[in-house]
Structure formats: C-alpha cells, structure tokens
Amino acid sequence: MDIKKLMQEMVTRDASDLFFRAGGIPRLRIDGKVVPMDTRVLSIEDVMFATEQLANTKQCEVFRNKLDVDFAVYLAEFNRRFRVSIFTQRNWPSIVIRNV
C-alpha cells in the first residue's frame, strides 16, 4: 500500500492524523473522529516499505536499532510538513503521521 497516496487523501480530507499499523487497517483522524480508509489489513512489509519511503537512511537505522524514531518531513508534492512517529506496539510496527 502506497503511504504517499494515503497522505494525499489525508491532506484532501483535512485529517490531522494518519494511523498505519501492521495487523490493522489505515485510519484517519478527522474532526476528532477516527475513520477507516480501507478494508485491507496492513502487513509488516507494508509498514516497513512505508518506513523506507518516509525516513532517510539514518532514521531507518535508528528504527531498526531502537524500534522507535520520530522526525519531521516536508513533502513538496503536498506543500506540507508532517511529524512522523515510527514505533513498535505489541511487537507490530506502526506509523503515526501528523499533518502540521
């Protein structure tokens, strides 16, 4: 699943957060309510691929070593800045993206 397509939907729908967790479905927080984006359950591979799309080499290494990394990223295609948190929860990798 392409994380940048989901981020585009996040921007279009004016969502504050995107939740992307292995073993779950992608979700958005819109006006304080968490709503599903899709019905397909994400795999560990989906989350790791998204990590590689969002994080630079050093950030990916920090995640591999500490199982947690936080950073901000500016994506010109959206003309937006996002705060990204990649972590493990109950041994499943997860990503939370905040539209700032």
Stretches with model-predicted labels:
Residues 1-100:
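N-terminal "pre-motor" subdomain/linker immediately upstream of P-loop NTPase catalytic cores
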